[in-house]
């Protein structure tokens, strides 16, 4: 089975169309995250989701349980991807209230740094037990977490993918030029790209989107 592809940080309906036509499996929209240059209102996100012919993913962070439930009811996504300080207890409470998949982003160090595999694996196990359906392994830097364009440690990601019972997406610094190598090295369930296929924040390059999908899915 070929690797799944998620095109994230979508802000324009034409980019949603390109992503779907290129073979992306998931279209991600950042919703109500003020610090993100790709953030959309829930009304804008619903407009974009209406244009999608593939599974939709809401990406948000640091909201209360009630706010998350309300957001899911408004947008009816395939998955809710959480990038903030959410706890396993919040995930467990949310799991009982929504029917969509719940994905949790976990911060990995940049390729130039190291981290405790055991600590990260314990996080995965704790969130999986609480009800997470998938994890997004993304790069954490001093500049932020997610959408940084900084390559994560593939060595650590590969260990987590191998040891996790739950599907893991690889994110962080992926581009059409390195995604095939990343998939071969890490063997993730899926890959998640935003800045690596952009002209500017939130504006996708159609050729890069198409090439990224082709390169990702050609890897055995």
Residue ranges and their predicted role:
Residues 1-190, 195-220:
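Conserved N-terminal beta1-alpha1 strand-loop-helix module at the mouth
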């Amino acid at each position: 089975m070929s690797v799944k592809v998620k095109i994230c940080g979508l802000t324009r309906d034409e980019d949603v169309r390109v992503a779907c036509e290129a073979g992306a499996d998931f279209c991600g929209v950042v919703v109500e995250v003020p610090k993100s240059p790709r953030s959309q209102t829930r009304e804008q996100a619903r407009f974009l989701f209406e244009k999608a012919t593939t599974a939709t993913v809401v990406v948000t962070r640091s909201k209360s349980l009630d706010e998350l439930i309300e957001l899911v009811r408004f947008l009816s996504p395939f998955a809710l991807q959480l990038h903030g300080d959410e706890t396993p207890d919040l995930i467990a409470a949310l799991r009982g209230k929504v029917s969509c998949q719940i994905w949790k982003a976990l911060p990995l160090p940049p390729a130039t740094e190291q981290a405790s595999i055991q600590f990260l694996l314990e996080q995965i196990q704790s969130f999986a037990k609480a009800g997470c359906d998938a994890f997004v392994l993304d790069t954490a830097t001093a500049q932020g977490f997610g959408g940084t364009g900084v390559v994560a440690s593939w060595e650590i990601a590969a260990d987590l993918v191998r040891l996790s019972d739950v599907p893991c997406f690889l994110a962080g610094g992926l581009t059409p030029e390195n995604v095939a190598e990343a998939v071969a090295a890490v063997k993730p369930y899926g890959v998640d790209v935003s800045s690596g296929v952009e002209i500017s924040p939130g504006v996708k390059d159609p050729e890069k989107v198409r090439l990224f999908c082709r390169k990702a899915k050609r890897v055995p």
